Amino acid sequence: MELKIGRAIIKHGLEDLYEYSDVDVAIVGAGPAGLTAARYLAERGFKVLVFERRFSFGGGIGPGGNMIPKIVVQEEALPILKDFKVRFKPAGDGLYTVDPAELIAKLAAGAIDAGAKILLGVHVDDVIFRGDPPRVAGLLWIWTPIQMSGMHVDPLYTQAKAVIDATGHDAEVVSVAARKVPELGLQLQGEKSAWSEVSEKLVVEHTGRVAPGLYVAGIAVCAVYGLPRMGPIFGGMLMSGRKVAEVVAKDLAEVAYAVRA
């Protein structure tokens, strides 16, 4: 039995890694923005792979507000909650509360059911770039425990037509691309202190492409553009994920049309 268990895991696991070494969209971060983007892109028929450095979904959703098990979503984001069949409770002033565990479970299930692949325990180490002027064309990755050990292990590659940085406060993909491919012209301004009303609007407005092949969504937008943080309100994260999916879908459709022409 042990031999059969091991061989089944190795065979099918490596088949998945082989299959997803070339994708339409690679999303880094399985938080609210990344999972939302994954679902809406997969529904459009794109081959989507989500990298998550932890062995769990949800990003900052799980701890709720300072470990109190509720988060807040504003009215503008309710259509997204309804898409994912997430229940919500009115809290007044156009705000609603949501159970963090339910939101995590249904965002992840929604992305997976739409056809996205989520790979847990992966640290994205670098980007692939091509061309002059350059464009981002994929990612280099290793398993998170290897990265945490400090051992030098050469990474593997995933080729992607579009890469979305949904890594949160540190904007890790944009950060490494800015440092190692200066020709991309990227610069991180760093997020500011909290101003929720402003940030929830600006994070959606600034969501999108930051360089050819590279996009930013969620709280990573604040780090890139120097926007205020917002705390445990997640409507902006969800709407940012939906918007980046729309932007990426439009860009990839235009590229496909140009190739056919």
UniProtKB/Swiss-Prot annotation:
Instruction: Give the top-rank taxon of the lineage listed in the UniProt record for this protein.
Output: Archaea
Q: Name one GO biological process term.
A: thiamine diphosphate biosynthetic process
So, what pathway does this thing act in?
Cofactor biosynthesis; thiamine diphosphate biosynthesis
What parts of the sequence cross the membrane? none
What does the entry list as the binding residues for Fe cation?
D154, H169
Reaction(s) catalysed by this chain, per the record, are: hydrogen sulfide + glycine + NAD(+) = ADP-5-ethyl-4-methylthiazole-2-carboxylate + nicotinamide + 3 H2O + H(+)
Q: HAMAP family this protein is in? A: Thi4
Q: Which NCBIfam families match?
A: sulfide-dependent adenosine diphosphate thiazole synthase
Instruction: Describe the task this protein carries out.
Output: Involved in the biosynthesis of the thiazole moiety of thiamine. Catalyzes the conversion of NAD and glycine to adenosine diphosphate 5-(2-hydroxyethyl)-4-methylthiazole-2-carboxylate (ADT), an adenylated thiazole intermediate, using free sulfide as a source of sulfur.
Q: What is this protein called?
A: Thiamine thiazole synthase
Say which species the protein is native to.
Pyrobaculum calidifontis (strain DSM 21063 / JCM 11548 / VA1)
State the gene name recorded for this protein. Answer: thi4
